[in-house]
Amino acid sequence: MLSRGWFHRDLSGPDAETLLKGRGVPGSFLARPSRKNQGDFSLSVRVDDQVTHIRIQNSGDFYDLYGGEKFATSTELVEYYTQQQGILQDRDGTIIHLKYPLNCSDPTSERWYHGHMSGGQAESLLQAKGEPWTFLVRESLSQPGDFVLSVLNDQPKAAPGSPLRVTHIKVMCEGGRYTVGGSETFDSLTDLVEHFKKTGIEEASGAFVYLRQPYYATRVNAADIENRVLELNKKQESEDTAKAGFWEEFESLQKQEAKNLHQRLEGQRPENKSKNRYKNILPFDHSRVILQGRDSNIPGSDYINANYVKNQLLGPDENSKTYIASQGCLDATVNDFWQMAWQENTRVIVMTTREVEKGRNKCVPYWPEVGTQRVYGLYSVTNCKEHDTAEYKLRTLQISPLDNGDLVREIWHYQYLSWPDHGVPSEPGGVLSFLDQINQRQESLPHAGPIIVHCSAGIGRTGTIIVIDMLMESVSTKGLDCDIDIQKTIQMVRAQRSGMVQTEAQYKFIYVAIAQFIETTKKKLEIIQSQRGQESEYGNITYPPALRSAHAKASRTSSKHKEEVYENVHSKNKKEEKVKKQRSADKEKNKGSLKRNISLTPCRGLRWADRDL
């Protein structure tokens, strides 16, 4: 479900264009109040390098695009058109994609703010917590720009023994001030919550609702992550447990690890025990890499301690990158490692450990000395050259099967050497630059297979590197103002390989790395936007090739002066005469505005309504 962060309360048409061109990618969109028709809204969408504006009608009974399907809430309308790609299109057939919400900044950096959430979802979270007077704040689904304070009471919902009742209190934003009704208004959501934490809120019945224990969110608008890092660094109010928010989030993550009950039977086989560096760090069966071409009559012959890992939080059309998370090689597994690299067509290997650290063997060298060649099982590997940088060593290797020496593949081996023996790097710049080089290499090889990432156990540093790269890719794909959830991303990765991201320090390092990545990206954007005529494509943030080239022939002009800039939205069964009249009227009224006729492909819409209690 999309976050409602795409609704921008105080944004004009020209400002929306500037924002979408400067911070969005093709397919980015946002919604804003109509400055022309009170109660209506405007949907602004980036199409190629221009911006299209579509009016959303609020009839009082339903929302629609002046034609097409009708919906109970604006959220349902937007979700429908994001899920049903191809519904919105110009008369010339150009598709208008709603793909990536360009979210506004959260109204507060407080962690009790959860953004988009239905009443039912809030109830489930609070009732599962089970502590009376736990509260959270979320977006209003029925009234864009307003909010809801959801609080778990100390009385059951119905009969004794039933779940505790949840009270939902509407928080209205009027004239830039916040109120729950009555004469009291506040400058910010934070001020409102802090006030009622002290006084409680009196219901119409005379009973009081108290705000005692916040239910913290882990979701955050990517552009606001620096503020979230500051919040997580704060100590708890209780002096006897002076733990920062990072500790809280990581402990919560650890408690959820028990939910990953996937089997690991192959790694437990007696014949495979010698292939595991650590006897209890084993691959899940459902996602393990299976060595091909092995004798099925030999138990365990297809086993290697490695798992496929994919970013399942991105859609199939948004992400093509797959990783293999593997343990560091043992003497007994080097041949299997090269078998895996060959069968998966891997061209990039990422090693995040030294061979020996603090006198302990972390990974046996599975490559030959520079300028030499060596046979590993069924494959010959040559170390063609090595290049040293301040942070890492790059080896250029060649691999070929012994039975076909003419078939040669080049593999780039990146070994990160600046990770300390204990803890994490003191700053993330080196890791970000390292990943930038890796991604440039992988992207230059269009048919390359998964990137193999390993450390020693294949879960701590390996998980940290993979999660950072996934989050960078999410921001690169969806734009700087997308929602990210680091805890949820780690949960998703842990469901594919157990124990990924091992320590609180690694957890915090991910936050700090993504914060620096986003800050650097913002600065690059500012520089590029100041250079007239250049496309908004910067650093690691690149547009998906399919989106870059889509509808390249569409000719569009943008409004620079008009407050309201709209597409004319018509259903396909509308008469052309009406369209021509609208075109003529717009031509006189909004010179310089974007004037394209949008047709709605007839399709039945969703008819459910999300609760906003």
From Swiss-Prot:
It catalyses: O-phospho-L-tyrosyl-[protein] + H2O = L-tyrosyl-[protein] + phosphate. Phosphorylated on tyrosine residues. Binding of KITLG/SCF to KIT increases tyrosine phosphorylation. Phosphorylation at Tyr-566 by LYN enhances phosphatase activity. Phosphorylation at Thr-396 by TAOK3 leads to polyubiquitination and subsequent proteasomal degradation. Ubiquitinated after phosphorylation by TAOK3. Ubiquitinated by a cooperation between ITCH and WWP2 via 'Lys-27'-mediated polyubiquitin chains resulting in the reduction of its association with LCK. GO terms for cellular component: alpha-beta T cell receptor complex; apical dendrite; cell-cell junction; cytoplasm; nucleus; plasma membrane; protein-containing complex. Residues 246-517 form the Tyrosine-protein phosphatase domain. The modification Phosphotyrosine is found at residues 66, 379, 538, 566. One of its GO terms (molecular function) is transmembrane receptor protein tyrosine phosphatase activity. The modification Phosphoserine is found at residues 12, 59. The modification Phosphothreonine is found at residue 396. Substrate binds at residues 421, 455-461, 502. The N-terminal SH2 domain functions as an auto-inhibitory domain, blocking the catalytic domain in the ligand-free close conformation. Monomer. Interacts with MTUS1. Interacts with MILR1 (tyrosine-phosphorylated). Interacts with KIT. Interacts with SIRPA/PTPNS1. Interacts with LILRB1 and LILRB2. Interacts with LILRB4. Interacts with FCRL2 and FCRL4. Interacts with FCRL3 and FCRL6 (tyrosine phosphorylated form). Interacts with CD84. Interacts with CD300LF. Interacts with CDK2. Interacts with KIR2DL1; the interaction is enhanced by ARRB2. Interacts (via SH2 1 domain) with ROS1; the interaction is direct and promotes ROS1 dephosphorylation. Interacts with EGFR; inhibits EGFR-dependent activation of MAPK/ERK. Tyrosine phosphatase enzyme that plays important roles in controlling immune signaling pathways and fundamental physiological processes such as hematopoiesis. Dephosphorylates and negatively regulate several receptor tyrosine kinases (RTKs) such as EGFR, PDGFR and FGFR, thereby modulating their signaling activities. Belongs to the protein-tyrosine phosphatase family. Non-receptor class 2 subfamily. PANTHER family: TYROSINE-PROTEIN PHOSPHATASE CORKSCREW, TYROSINE-PROTEIN PHOSPHATASE NON-RECEPTOR TYPE 6. This is Tyrosine-protein phosphatase non-receptor type 6. It comes from Rattus norvegicus (Rat).
